[in-house]
Amino acid sequence: MSVPPFTIRPAAPRLDGPTGPVAVAPGVHWVGALDPGLRNFDVILKTANGTTYNAYAVRGSEGVAVIDTVKAEFAGDFFARLEAVARYDEIRLIVLNHLEPDHTGAVPELLRRAPQAQVRLSPRGLPMLRALLKDDFERYDIKGVTTGQSVSLGDRDLQFFTTPFVHWPDTQCTWLAAERVLFTCDLFGSHYCDGRLFNDLVGDFRFSFEYYFDRIMRPFRSFVAQALDLIEPLDFGIIAPAHGPILRSHPRDYLTHTRRLISSRLAAETGSEKTLLIFYVSAYGATAQLAQAIHDGAAESPDVRVSLFDLEGGEITPFLDLIEEADGIALGTPTINGDAVRTIWEMLAALVDIETRGKLGAAFGSYGWSGEAVRLVETRLQGLKMRLPEPGLRVKLHPSAAELEEGRAFGRRLADHLTGRAAPREVDFAEIAAR
């Protein structure tokens, strides 16, 4: 199948990801796709870090099951990863936990390549699959399944749990007891793209997890509560959602977290790690390059959790809880008409509603003529009682290789200030004004 190439917007940071499948558990592989450039999902939801379309292959002694697929534009990535772990004639089962297009874009072609496969989904999903396949629907072994039913792969079974309206009528979960993996599709998902895939390896995605819940699951919270009741007795060790990080570290915490989100927000903790959030807006990609370099430098510290956000793709309000809990923030902006861009000022204005006193602050950006934006942002950060241990970093036009290294060094210094490895220092108003 011919799939058009996908090009990331120049202003978006490119997150390196796996080129092949990724082992999730014995006999279980991630075969999905990364979409780091996505900035708006389903019209209603901004995606500052893009998203992932998680699909999985499960191997048993008598065949392979494929659980969900990907958005059509990324079918090529999906098939390449799937072919690395299975032949098409080995595919015995295709499980569709949810029929939304971002999970079924490769289904027609997958069935063409593996026509012998059984297709199992919730009964409410049958009309939607018929609409997707049109006249081809009758060609395949397609059946609805309900809670408690299962399909054997020989030495392991996949059991189904009907969880309607989480967030479509057709949604279900699939349980692999042999490896304690629960495939939940949109439940426990988040629009957060990070090529490291697992929740114990990626950046801080709490904001995305909660924002996703607020925008997608909250209108169906009574159904979410019923779904949690249904799956809570399972002894799962991994939650494998269809979007965002795979939850292999303390997965039950996310169930508890979701219960709390049904009625109230959860103030999560990051343990002994320090957290640095980097927000930026980029006109021609130069500030984005600088932001990525600062991120990479700071991320070299094992004691600092660093997250990078493109504010062009996100609303500001969902970030406020995250900023309030963070130890430091760095803001990047180009200089346009002698000023920082509007989105950065909107974020700075929103910070008056949260506690910022004593947090580490920093500013950076590219410019063409005068370069006042960094200085103006620094002044406002000081007005918010944040501490600025490093003078802001400015680059004229696009950064050179040497200037990108300066960005990485800037990030390393910010991390050192957060962890106490650097001597305390405070940039004062006179130093800012002098620039």
Curated annotation (Swiss-Prot):
Record-annotated Flavodoxin-like domain positions: 276-415
Keywords noted in UniProt: Electron transport, Flavoprotein, FMN, Iron, Metal-binding, Oxidoreductase, Transport
Region (Zinc metallo-hydrolase) residue spans: 48-228
InterPro entries on file: Flavodoxin/NO_synth, Flavodoxin_CS, Flavoprotein-like_sf, Metallo-B-lactamas, NADH_oxidoreductase_modular, ODP_dom, RibonucZ/Hydroxyglut_hydro, Rubredoxin-O_OxRdtase
Protein's UniProt keywords contain Transmembrane: no
Uppermost EC category: oxidoreductase
Cofactor(s) demanded: FMN; Fe cation
EC number: 1.-.-.-
Cofactor note: Binds 1 FMN per monomer. Binds 2 iron ions per subunit.
Residues involved in Fe cation 1 binding: 98, 100, 167, 186
Gene: fprA
Protein name, entry field: Type A flavoprotein fprA
MF-aspect GO terms: electron transfer activity; FMN binding; metal ion binding; oxidoreductase activity
Family according to the record: In the N-terminal section; belongs to the zinc metallo-hydrolase group 3 family.
